[in-house]
Design a protein with these regions (language model features):
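TPR/Sel1-like alpha-solenoid repeat signature
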Residues: 122, 194-201
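TPR/TPR-like (Sel1-like) alpha-helical repeat modules
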Residues: 214-219
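Membrane-proximal, proline-rich intrinsically disordered regions
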Residues: 3-50
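Conserved, well-structured interaction surfaces
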Residues: 23, 27-31, 35-39, 63-136, ...
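Short linear capping/connector segments at secondary-structure termini
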Residues: 12-16, 73-76, 143-150
């Protein structure tokens, strides 16, 4: 026997697209963007993709990832370390794009906090594109939020990517806190962004700019 009334479900397992437009949603989105760094730091894939092939790190006698150290034909896009990092970083980048685009219309947060969240998003986006540039060269440089599946992909250039990374970090630095607050520990700080900017300049062969940023950082800490 069927029910007499229409069942209206209160779905709590999914977050609507408008949630990020709220004060709590913007803060939660920023936390979600940070979580995408888990694919790189303190993980096997981060080690495999960064220092395999050097004297610092090598494979053992056993294990299924030895080919990443010897660059065999098994080292391709089907590799879990590559696909997981790629997917997680682009999810993080898209979240950052949403934060940057939507923050201005969010109510219930002070302008200072909104500026800080945008600065954090720009740092994370710059960080991810820097790692992707090191690993893959030119990639799809997405700077706006993607809200629907798309097959429209365009490969950018390393020069354009470095220019955007430098722009993001330069814009983020003034709005980041000088040091972490004990009550809100773990957020990116101004010195962290300055350190990354100095490193990016170094990789982009802008040695004078790198020295200037890093010397200022050293003298201020």
């Amino acid at each position: 026997q069927s029910c007499n009334d229409l069942l209206t479900e209160n779905v709590v397992s999914r977050i609507g697209n408008d949630y990020i437009n709220t004060a709590k949603g913007l803060n939660d989105a920023t936390s979600a963007a940070y979580s995408s760094m888990r694919s790189w730091y303190g993980t096997e894939r981060g080690m495999n993709l960064s220092i395999f092939g050097t004297d610092s790190y090598t494979n053992g006698a056993d294990g299924s990832w030895k080919f990443m150290n010897t660059y065999t034909t098994d080292f391709d896009t089907r590799n879990g370390s590559i696909s997981e990092l790629w997917n997680d970083f682009y999810l993080g980048i898209n979240t950052c794009n949403a934060i940057i685009e939507r923050s201005a219309k969010v109510t219930g947060l002070s302008d200072a906090i909104k500026k800080q969240r945008v600065a954090e998003a720009k740092f994370i986006r710059a960080h991810h594109y820097f790692i992707l540039t090191q690993l893959f060269g030119g990639v799809d440089l997405r700077l706006t939020e993607t809200v629907a599946p798309t097959k429209d992909v365009k490969r950018s250039t390393v020069a354009a990517q470095y220019a955007q990374i430098i722009k993001d970090l330069s814009e983020a630095i003034p709005d980041l806190e000088a040091k972490s607050k004990s009550a809100d520990f773990g957020r990116v700080t101004r010195p962290a962004a300055e350190h990354l900017l100095g490193k990016v300049y170094l990789y982009d062969n802008k040695f004078v700019d790198s020295a200037n940023v890093l010397e200022t950082l050293i003298s201020s800490t």
